[in-house]
Amino acid sequence: MEEILIILRIYLILYSINLKQMIPEIRIEEYNYDLPDGRIAKYPLPERDSSKLLCFRNGRTETYRFTDMPSLLPEDSMIIFNDTKVVPARLHFQRKSGAHIEIFCLEPVDPEEYVMMFAVTGSCRWKCIVGNVKRWKNDTLNLYNPFDDETIAAMNLKADLIERTAETSVVEFTWCDSIPFSRVLEICGSVPIPPYLNRDTEEIDLERYQTLYARYRGSVAAPTAGLHFTENVLEAIRNKGICIDTVCLHVGAGTFLPVKSSLVSEHTMHREPFVVTADFLRRLIAHQGKLVAVGTTSVRTLESLYYIGVNCIEKGYPHDVGQWDPYIRSYGYSLTEALNAIISYMDAKGLDQLQAGTRIIIVPGYDFKIVDVLVTNFHQPQSTLLLLISAFLKGEWKQVYDYALGNDFRFLSYGDSSILFRE
């Protein structure tokens, strides 16, 4: 038995060394640029589709309006949106001592499924980020209600700290039995707008920090590339004969986190759950033209499907996609083989929907399997999203961002848009 353990330890050490050799060695300082605070859009424009649109194609960068988007899409393309819905996941509590504790709901723990979580009554548990957590001495917190709002008071919402870790905590919420948790959040919570806006959530954010096509509750950050789309723009896309489809990835708070380590290989990606249907996978296989992804969350979902398919082929089930799975070895399967493997698994299990998770990080050197065109906003310096843009443009991100900075484009969540063509 002892010999087996020694062999196992040696194997793990060798595997770790080999893995480090295969992971791209990328210094995050190479993906920095000067972003003045005045270039960060703190509020949305009056009209969603009145934003500017940068087009990068064949090495050329040009300025359009977002209403020009449909005319720039290839006629044979299929455009994919992320139809997740942002939930008012930020809650403010108060200790009896008067200390304020902010709780940011990240991921359901009990019930674990999002649909069940939002329907549950009486109590539930979430993985959370807790502000001022050191001041929370394991006592029960009451919801902060400074204006004695009767509707909020009637909820009788309380919070108990169940488990504390370095970055997150498990919190149990209790409230009156007759109301689903989705309604509790609607009444008691606030929309968690990005911290770089440097302001509190306002009435305008309830509508504008949400896409028009948002459908399934679960995100704590909006898939902001979709904020520009209006019914008029969508109708123009349909009139061009372009197929519109959706995936659903619930965006986590990790989207706000910069890469703090000097080497990207030392950065840890958070798991994000996603859902696709078998019918969508069949349409994806049948599509012969260009694939347009709206937002980096759609890209990560679509590109993860290949590795989910590989897991179905090699392991017999759709194991979550690991952060470095695309880089650790070569995979000899075609995209069609991978997608068909997922469908076969779903058919065998009688599933209409596949629920899976991904930690995939897309960095320079990544081999794109599905996405040809990307619609996206302008991202923070030294972020994993900027690494994705660099990977997509094969290193030409600086040209695009220099052009945007030099031509008065607005940056980040409420900023302007871009459409990028991968050559």
Model regions: which residues?
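Short, positively charged and aromatic/hydrophobic N-terminal segments
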Residues: I7-R9, I13-N18
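Surface-exposed, charge/polar-rich loops and edge strands
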Residues: M22-E423
